[in-house]
Amino acid sequence: RKQFNILVGKTTAEEAKLRLASATRLEAAPALEISGQDLLANVPRSVALHPEDIWKAINPQVSQLVDAVADMVARLGPELSSDLIANGITLCGGGAQLSGLADRIEIETNARVHIPEDPACAVARGLSLVLKYFDDFRPILECTEDRY
């Protein structure tokens, strides 16, 4: 929108994101022609959108996310660090599907990154298991003053 002065629909934006977005720069990837409403002339218009255009738009937020994960990993104590080395990081949420994100996190943290099947729903599925077996999880979920 800012670069091309064109307003596109949600479906078009989602298609562009899925086909072009990456947490790393994509060299020589093909452009995608998108159509929308020209915000200046108020008429329909098409533009060629390149992966580099998407990367420039999302890289500041991706870098902030990767830096936050790396900072968290740097603050782990020895016990959690050994767990991290043994088990890696599980990347959940819809953003986990962003091409190259797991690779960037692996490089920054020196830890393996796993993406579960259907990462957008992974947290909800895990929470449903906790609720289903709440009594089994109660000892680790209850906060007591002597624990914190």
Segments from the language model and where they lie:
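Glycine-rich phosphate-binding loops at beta-strand->alpha-helix junctions
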Residues: A21, R25, S81-I105
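Interdomain boundary/hinge elements
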Residues: Q3, L7-T11, E117-P119, L141-C143
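A glycine-rich phosphate-binding loop feature that marks nucleotide/adenosyl-phosphate handling sites
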Residues: E14-R19, G88, E145-Y148
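Conserved phosphate-binding/catalytic loops in two-lobed NTP-binding clefts
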Residues: D103-L129, F137, T144
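Phosphate-binding glycine-rich/basic clefts of nucleotide- and phosphate-handling proteins
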Residues: R1-N59, A74, L84
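Residue-level signature of catalytic and energy-coupling elements of molecular machines
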Residues: V69, L91, L127
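Phosphate/ATP-binding catalytic cores across multiple sugar-kinase/actin-like superfamilies
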Residues: A57-I85, V130-Y133
